[in-house]
UniProtKB/Swiss-Prot annotation:
This is Phosphoribosylformylglycinamidine cyclo-ligase. Its main location: cytoplasm. Pathway: Purine metabolism; IMP biosynthesis via de novo pathway; 5-amino-1-(5-phospho-D-ribosyl)imidazole from N(2)-formyl-N(1)-(5-phospho-D-ribosyl)glycinamide: step 2/2. One of its GO terms (molecular function) is ATP binding. It comes from Klebsiella pneumoniae subsp. pneumoniae (strain ATCC 700721 / MGH 78578). It is found in: Cytoplasm. Pfam families: AIRS, AIRS_C.
Length: 345
């Protein structure tokens, strides 16, 4: 026998009791997201989910994402309640552009020291995002890793699986000359461009919490949760012939629209069809950012762009607006062999 101190996992910086307390805190809100296809509850080694029986040839669609350095801004401002919505939105919006209905979602939360209140706030936001998109939060991983993260700093990642009928996959192959492009308004910068946002804040020397923009703090504009378009877009897909959908994330207009365009087509965007929300004007002015760089980095007020036949454009816009979206004609598709896939004029 020796007189050495007996060490525990907690002595090493990992508090299993805190992790268990977190699970107890979130059980109720997670249960609210449950779908009928989900089998079992939290706590299993894996989550089980049956395929909805309405699909004849179901195709699974998967996606994973994070929220980038918007998370750093949220941590600096100690505002954790909506970052979970952002996390879900970035995943489910990527699924729905292919026509997929999100089925279930999992999250990964890693931190240097687990703060149960902060983690519960984030996961409550994740559950809210799942409710907005109709998918079940079936599980996740909370990793307390002392030495890997500074103090209570944390990172999050999300993973989502959806399903689409094989014959109804939206892949852009039907896009053709004369299609109309319909825009869906964003709620702000969503979850992209925040390294530039934070650089602009640093260079300009402003305090986002005390700087007023349109009657509310700049921080409110910058941390507005990413809009989730799933239910509106699925209703649209069921009503009109949608040819393609682009989710405007990293890379902005220049990189995301071409991802859904067939060869020998070009998207013409009418810059006069909408006004940038004030937060983008502030960012451009405060950072002296060029117009081209703005369209490359930010969504500039446009969260999604939908291509569909011109004859169905008015019906689509009316349906989307009835669902609470702000939709408008933003441009059209023309035949072109130009290497410039997107023109903003």
């Amino acid at each position: 026998m020796t007189d050495k101190t007996s060490l525990s996992y907690k002595d090493a910086g990992v508090d299993i009791d805190a992790g268990n307390a977190l699970v107890d805190r979130i059980k109720g809100v997670v249960k609210k997201t449950r779908r009928p296809e989900v089998m079992g509850g939290l706590g299993g080694f894996g989550a089980l989910c049956a395929l909805p029986q309405k699909y004849r040839e179901p195709v699974l669609v998967s996606g994973t994402d994070g929220v980038g350095t918007k998370l750093r801004l949220a941590m600096d401002l100690k505002r954790h309640d909506t970052i979970g919505i952002d996390l879900v939105a970035m995943c489910v919006n990527d699924l729905v552009v292919q026509g997929a209905e999100p089925l279930f979602f999992l999250d990964y939360y890693a931190t240097g020291k687990l703060d149960v209140d902060t983690a519960a706030s984030v996961i409550n936001g994740i559950a809210e995002g799942c409710l907005q998109s109709g998918c079940a939060l079936v599980g996740g991983e909370t990793a307390e890793m002392p030495g890997m993260y500074h103090g209570e700093d944390y990172d999050v990642a999300g993973f989502c699986v959806g399903v689409v009928e094989k014959s109804e996959i939206i892949d852009g192959s039907k896009v053709t000359d004369g299609d109309v492009l319909v825009a869906l308004a964003s709620s702000g910068p969503h979850s992209n461009g925040y390294s530039l946002v934070r650089k602009i804040i640093e260079v300009s020397g402003v305090d986002p919490q005390t700087t007023d923009l349109d009657g509310k703090p700049l921080a409110d504009h910058l941390l507005a949760p990413t809009r989730i378009y799933v239910k509106s877009v699925l209703d649209l897909i069921a009503s009109v012939d949608v040819h393609a959908i682009a989710h405007l994330t990293g890379g902005g207009f220049w990189e995301n629209i071409p991802r859904v365009l067939p060869d020998n087509t070009q998207a013409i965007i009418d810059e006069s069809s909408w006004q940038w929300p004030s937060v983008f004007n502030w960012l451009q002015t405060a950072g002296n950012v060029s117009q081209h760089e703005m369209y490359r980095t930010f969504n500039c007020g446009v969260g999604m762009i939908i291509a569909l036949p011109a004859a169905e454009a008015d019906k689509a816009i009316a349906l989307l607006n009835d669902k609470g979206e702000n939709a408008w004609k933003i441009g059209y598709i023309k035949a072109s062999d130009s290497e410039q896939r997107v023109v903003i004029a």
